[in-house]
Amino acid sequence: RRAFPGVTRGGGMLSYFTELNRKPVPRGVFDFVTHTVCPIVHAADDISVMETLESLPSIFASTRSMMGKTPYHLGPSGIPCRDNPYGAAVAGNSENGRVCLADMDPRQRGLFAAAWSLGLAAAAARGGLDAIALGAATGPQGVIYRKASYAQPWFDGGNAAVYPAYHVLAGLAAMSGAKRLDVASSNS
């Protein structure tokens, strides 16, 4: 703190909750604690990816119990993997498949990622997180189309400038600071 007075310091893991759980940060040292989530670590089929949203309340509650009242920020999270804490690299996915620990996932460019991102944001709001980062502006976890080294069917050669998740982020940004309203379905 002497070297950088007034600078906010965060601690945690650049990877997932699992690593934070294995090596929790000491309380009172950081101004916020962070980790990321990735739904394609263990399985990459559509149902399994959406089911990862069901684990978030437990992850958020466990993290909160470790860190007390320290602000809780969820780092950049999307369907593709940013890094592989379990190996040398993330898996390549030039064929646009559904691949575990892949650096690129075609669902990130579609309605699937928009729905998953909204589910993540809703779980984070219910979990009392102080800030979240969903994906990235461009690239494999991006919300804005840019030509890439991998094929992006429908977007390459098309007129679309943004992916559906962009609209989720824009809507969430417009509601920043608004009161959260809990709703429940009778189809439990």
Can you name each region flagged by the protein language model?
Residues 1-111:
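Noncatalytic carbohydrate-binding groove/subsite architecture in carbohydrate-active enzymes
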Residues 30, 53-56, 117, 162-166:
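Amphipathic alpha-helical segments in well-structured domains
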